[in-house]
């Protein structure tokens, strides 16, 4: 289960993307999390997913 706080979520997701997953889709599939919910939660605080960097920036 991922954290609800968007800034903690940002840190956790970016760390996992950097260290364990080659894409947001793979992270979401493996953790059984909604990609849309993660993207929206982080968009609400000004971050978007960059596939080229495999990070939310």
Language-model features: locations:
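N-terminal acidic leader/helix
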Residues: 1-23
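Short alpha-helical "recognition helix" segments of helix-turn-helix
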Residues: 27-28
